C-alpha cells in the first residue's frame, strides 16, 4: 500500500472538495436554501477533529445468535496483525471509541457476521469498518476482495484516506479508487484487493466490463446509506451490485439516520444482521433560556439585534434567516455597523463553507449569519447565542419544531447555558412561536429590547 498511501497523504482536503461541482447552479435559481445530505456529510467529516466529545447511548439489537456479544476496551484484545495495530496507533487512536468497542468484535468475528450500524460522523464508525476491510484481505490472492460503496466521489476519497493511513504499514495490501476520472485497462483484470468508490463506477467495472469477479468479494460495505437513498439512481445500483455477490459475503451497512426508508433499504442488503444504534446526546432545551421579541418589521428586527449587542457582551452567535437575500441584507447592515460577520449560504462552494466555519469556530468572526443550509450535525462548542431572525416553518408555513430544536440546540451544550432569541413581526409569526412553545412545553419569555435593564438580565 506504500505508493498509494503516499499519494493519498499528499492530497490536500481543499483539492478534494474543490472538485465538487457547486459553482454553477443548474435550473431555476431559488432564494431558499436546502441542505444537501452529501455535502453536509462531507463537511462534518472534514471539520471533525478526532472523535466527537459528546455523550453517547448505544442500543444493541442482537439478531444473529452466533454473533459475539462481548465488547473490547483495547485494540490489543482484537488480536490484530502488528502492522495494522501500528497503523491504528499512528492515527492517534489509543483506545476504541464506544461504537468500536461493541462493533469490532462482530466485524472481525470468524465466521464473518453481518451488521447494520446507525451512527453519525465523529463516532469512529469509518475507522471501525476500514479496520474490518483491511483485516479481511488475503494478500496471497491478487483480485478484489472488498467493495466499499460511498454515494459521492468526495466521500469515497475521505474513506480511502482513512484506509491509507490505517494501512500505511500493510505494504502488501493494494487499494484502488473506483470513482470518476479513474480509468482502467479493459484488457486486464483488476488486481487490487480493496475497491472504494461510487455505485455507478463499480457497477461498470464489475458487471458491464467484468474486470473483476463479484462472486469473489468477501466484504461488502455500504456507507452513508441515508445519503445513498437521497442520491438519484444509487439505490437501484446498490441493489444490482448486491445481487451479484456471494451469499456468504460479509455485509456491512452504515447510516447516520434510522428511518423506515433506510431500514427497508438495509433489509434488502443485509441478512441476519447484528444491529447497533449509536446516538449522540440529543439536543436539549434544558440549559437554554428562550425569549421572543416583538418587532414592527425587518428594520425593527435589526434594531432589536443592535440593542442586544449594545447592552450585553455577546460571544459567538449564529443568526438564522429564511432566505439567502435576507442573510445578505443583514450581513451588510451588521458589517457596516462594525460587527465581525461571516455569511454561510448555499451559494458558497464546499471549500468556501469550510473556510467560513473554520474562521467562525476559531473566533475570527463573532457572528455567523446563515440559512437552513447549516443543517444538523455541525457542532460549535463555544456558541452562546442563537437568534432566529426568521422562525423556521415548513412548506405550509407551520412551525417546524424539529428544525427549531436543531437550531437552538447548538447552544446550551456540553453543560453550558445558552440563549435563544426569536424575532416576531406579526400574528402569524407569533402563532408559530406559540406552537413551538406548546410543542416543547418550555416557556418562551417576552423580551423588551428597548429596555436596557431587560436586556442586561438575559446576560446574567
Swiss-Prot record:
GO terms for molecular function: ATP binding; ATP hydrolysis activity; mRNA binding; RNA helicase activity. The modification Phosphothreonine is found at residue 30. The keyword Cell cycle does not apply. Residues 287-455 form the Helicase C-terminal domain. GO terms for cellular component: cytoplasmic stress granule; nuclear pore cytoplasmic filaments; nucleoplasm; nucleus. The modification Phosphoserine is found at residue 26. Its EC number is 3.6.4.13. A motif (Q motif) lies at residues 73-101. A motif (DEAD box) lies at residues 223-226. Disulfide bonds: none annotated. One of its GO terms (biological process) is poly(A)+ mRNA export from nucleus. Its main location: cytoplasm. Belongs to the DEAD box helicase family. DDX19/DBP5 subfamily. This is DEAD-box helicase Dbp80.
Amino acid at each position: 500500500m506504500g505508493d498509494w498511501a503516499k499519494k493519498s497523504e499528499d492530497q490536500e482536503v481543499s483539492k478534494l472538495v474543490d472538485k465538487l461541482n457547486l459553482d454553477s447552479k443548474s435550473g431555476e435559481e431559488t432564494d431558499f436554501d436546502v441542505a444537501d445530505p452529501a455535502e453536509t456529510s462531507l463537511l462534518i467529516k472534514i471539520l471533525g477533529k478526532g472523535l466527537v466529545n459528546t455523550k453517547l447511548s448505544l442500543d444493541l439489537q442482537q439478531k444473529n445468535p452466533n454473533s459475539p456479544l462481548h465488547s473490547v476496551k483495547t485494540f490489543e484484545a482484537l488480536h490484530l496483525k502488528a502492522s495494522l495495530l501500528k497503523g491504528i496507533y499512528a492515527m492517534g487512536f489509543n483506545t476504541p471509541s464506544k461504537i468500536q468497542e461493541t462493533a469490532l468484535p462482530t466485524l472481525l468475528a470468524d465466521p464473518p457476521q453481518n451488521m447494520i450500524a446507525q451512527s453519525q460522523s465523529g463516532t469512529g464508525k469509518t475507522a471501525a469498518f476500514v479496520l474490518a476491510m483491511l483485516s479481511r484481505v488475503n494478500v496471497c490472492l491478487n483480485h478484489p476482495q472488498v467493495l466499499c460503496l460511498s454515494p459521492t466521489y468526495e466521500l469515497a476519497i475521505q474513506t480511502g484516506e482513512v484506509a491509507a493511513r490505517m494501512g500505511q504499514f500493510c505494504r502488501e495490501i493494494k487499494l484502488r479508487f473506483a470513482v470518476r476520472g479513474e480509468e482502467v485497462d479493459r484488457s486486464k483484470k483488476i488486481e487490487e484487493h480493496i475497491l472504494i468508490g461510487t455505485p455507478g463506477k463499480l457497477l461498470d467495472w464489475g458487471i458491464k466490463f467484468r474486470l473483476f469477479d463479484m462472486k469473489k468479494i468477501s466484504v461488502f460495505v455500504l456507507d452513508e446509506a441515508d445519503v445513498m437513498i437521497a442520491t438519484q439512481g444509487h439505490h437501484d445500483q446498490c441493489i444490482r451490485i448486491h445481487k451479484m455477490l456471494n451469499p456468504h459475503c460479509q455485509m456491512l451497512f452504515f447510516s447516520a439516520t434510522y428511518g423506515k426508508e433506510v431500514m427497508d433499504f438495509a433489509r434488502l442488503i443485509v441478512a441476519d444482521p447484528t444491529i447497533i444504534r449509536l446516538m449522540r446526546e440529543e439536543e436539549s432545551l434544558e440549559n437554554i433560556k428562550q425569549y421572543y421579541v416583538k418587532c414592527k418589521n425587518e428594520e425593527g428586527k435589526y434594531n432589536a439585534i443592535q440593542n442586544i449587542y449594545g447592552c450585553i457582551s455577546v460571544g459567538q452567535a449564529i443568526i438564522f434567516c429564511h432566505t439567502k437575500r435576507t442573510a445578505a441584507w443583514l450581513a451588510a447592515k451588521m458589517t457596516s455597523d462594525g460587527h465581525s460577520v461571516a455569511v454561510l449560504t448555499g451559494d458558497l462552494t464546499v471549500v468556501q463553507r469550510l473556510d467560513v466555519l473554520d474562521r467562525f469556530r476559531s473566533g475570527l468572526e463573532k457572528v455567523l449569519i446563515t440559512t437552513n443550509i447549516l443543517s444538523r450535525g455541525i457542532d460549535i462548542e463555544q456558541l452562546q447565542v442563537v437568534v432566529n431572525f426568521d422562525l423556521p416553518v415548513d412548506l405550509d408555513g407551520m412551525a417546524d419544531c424539529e428544525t427549531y430544536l436543531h437550531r437552538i440546540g447548538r447552544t446550551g451544550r456540553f453543560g453550558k447555558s445558552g440563549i435563544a432569541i426569536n424575532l416576531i413581526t406579526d400574528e402569524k409569526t407569533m402563532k408559530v412561536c406559540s406552537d413551538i412553545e406548546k410543542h416543547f412545553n418550555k416557556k418562551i419569555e417576552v423580551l423588551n429590547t428597548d429596555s436596557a435593564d431587560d436586556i442586561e438580565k438575559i446576560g446574567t
